[in-house]
């Protein structure tokens, strides 16, 4: 069973938070969930179980109908499934965009963008345009853009869903690199149980009719701050099997 995250270590807390839309549709039953600082929390579950609603709630884009949401930061970035890059702007300009909108001085935002582009392995592509890049490279640009605002909280809505297996794994590596270097708190949606187990410190399994938290798992061998730290493959395989069986044999 999951261990409770103490309030003083949680960046985001949902306390009996639910969501009922104005048409009467209940998207979420009351949910209790805490996101510990500098950890990756992954949401998995079938379509329509309220994962995106929960993510939007964390971002402040929708409010709980009842219960409470506590977010102890305003420094956050939201990464969508579609990279949503400006086609007429260079990669450099796209990565700088969020910092520019926040009023970050030009020299500083250029330096932030340079570091972010280098971190996701796209140094040398600063003058390229989105149409010249592959889908995986455009997603890396989106990830670089998301950190130029220097967020504490990174919210990701199935960001790798459109990528092939090779690029999904590479983007997972990029996310872990960013987490290690910046101590980010991450809330991440995926339909891939393997991806959830690989990336998550805790994994929230949601069910439908309406959306509710089925079970919260703590990883027996989570990502470590040290890149070379070994992980327990057998324990992770067992966790993957448990989650898969809980979701009715869904895709691993």
Each predicted region: which residue ranges?
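The feature captures the beta-strand-to-loop junction immediately N-terminal to the Walker
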Residues: 44-46
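Short coil-to-helix segment of the ABC ATPase nucleotide-binding domain corresponding to the Q-loop/switch region
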Residues: 89-96
């Amino acid at each position: 069973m999951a261990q409770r995250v103490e309030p003083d270590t949680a960046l985001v807390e949902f306390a009996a938070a639910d969501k009922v839309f104005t048409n009467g549709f209940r998207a979420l039953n009351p949910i209790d969930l805490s996101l510990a600082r500098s950890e990756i929390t992954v949401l998995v579950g079938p379509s329509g179980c309220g994962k995106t609603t929960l993510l939007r709630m964390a971002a402040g884009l929708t409010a709980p109908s009842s219960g409470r949401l506590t977010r102890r930061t305003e420094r956050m970035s939201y990464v969508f499934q579609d990279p949503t890059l400006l086609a007429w702007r260079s990669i450099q300009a796209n990565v700088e965009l969020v910092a520019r909108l926040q009023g970050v001085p030009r020299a500083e935002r250029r330096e932030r963008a340079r570091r972010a582009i280098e971190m996701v392995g796209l140094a040398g592509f600063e003058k390229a345009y989105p149409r010249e890049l592959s889908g995986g490279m455009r997603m890396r640009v989106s990830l670089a853009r998301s950190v130029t605002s220097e967020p504490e909280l990174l919210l990701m809505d199935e960001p790798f869903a459109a990528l092939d297996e090779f690029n999904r794994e590479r983007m997972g590596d990029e996310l872990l690199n960013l987490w290690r270097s910046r101590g980010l708190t991450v809330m991440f949606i995926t339909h891939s149980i393997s991806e959830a187990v690989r990336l998550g410190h805790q994994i929230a399994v949601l069910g439908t009719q309406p959306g509710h938290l089925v079970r919260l798992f703590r990883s027996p061998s989570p990502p470590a701050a040290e890149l070379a730290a070994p992980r327990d493959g057998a324990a992770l395989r067992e966790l993957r099997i448990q989650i898969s069986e809980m979701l009715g044999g869904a895709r691993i």
